[in-house]
């Protein structure tokens, strides 16, 4: 449900970063967003390929990236992730280079497992959103919608 609500906020030229511990649900949330923005049924984790692309319309794409194994920003530039951003939505896990990403005005999504969770069947997550002024209205609307 959260992925559906998030997907409705995103448009071309958006960079969304996902941060949190291993196994917290970053890839799961990204897959949910991609499933809701495309007709793709099988979304593959970019853990080993670093980037997976999914078509939207015409020459527009969603880029799902995992920077866990990236060592420096030069490697990011070699891949071309930020080239022609106006034709992309970028979902980026493990944003190690936040200081380099400022010019792209990312929406930062941090996911944590809630402590003292009483549910034995599933773990609850805490999602925190932050970003530049570009995201202020969308974050406010999303907070109200999700009651974050």
Question: Model-predicted segments: where are they?
Answer:
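N-terminal pre-Walker A segment at the start of P-loop NTPase domains
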Residues: 1-5
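Phosphate-binding P-loop
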Residues: 6-13
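Hydrophobic anchor at the beta1->P-loop junction of P-loop NTPases
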Residues: 16-18
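The conserved Walker
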Residues: 22
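Conserved lysine of the Walker
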Residues: 26
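Conserved nucleotide-sensing/catalytic segment adjacent to the nucleotide-binding pocket
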Residues: 47, 53-96
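Short phosphate-coordinating micro-motif centered on Lys-Gly-acidic
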Residues: 82-148
